[in-house]
Regions:
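A conserved beta-strand/loop element that lines the FAD pocket in flavoprotein oxidoreductases
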Residues: 116
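N-terminal FAD cofactor-binding segment of flavoenzymes
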Residues: 44-86
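Alpha-helical elements of the RecA-like P-loop NTPase motor core of helicases
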Residues: 40, 68, 112
Length: 116
């Protein structure tokens, strides 16, 4: 496999996770991304001093491999629980789903470690 090279299209979560696993297996990998930054739907954009999440506002963890990645990110301070409240008229109640997570300081914090 020494002369085999891999091209991964897209530096979002799926593309970077794929490239990361290939690199861990000592494969030669090149990631191609058309945007200026990493993240895809988990991208954090900047305009001057303002940073904002450009795509997904939160993630959920449903698969075991992704849950392990989220647990590592949580311990490293790159992920935090998000407990939104639903508002209607003058009433508010907790959202029905408990495993909503947000990247810290932005969603792209979840993909940056995979790009190393």
């Amino acid at each position: 496999m020494d002369d085999v090279r891999f091209a991964v299209i897209g530096a979002g979560m799926a593309g970077l996770a794929c490239a990361h696993e290939l690199a861990r297996a000592d494969a030669k990998v090149t990631v191609f991304e058309r945007a200026r930054g990493l993240g895809g739907r988990l991208a954090t954009r900047r305009i001057g001093s303002l940073a904002f999440d450009h795509g997904a506002q939160f993630i959920t963890t449903r698969s075991r491999p992704f849950s392990r990645h989220a647990e590592t990110a949580l311990r490293a301070g790159m992920l935090d629980a998000w407990r939104p409240r639903i508002m209607e008229d003058d009433r508010a109640w907790p959202a029905p789903i408990e495993d909503w997570w947000i990247g810290q300081p932005g969603m792209s914090a979840l993909v940056r470690p995979l790009a190393r």
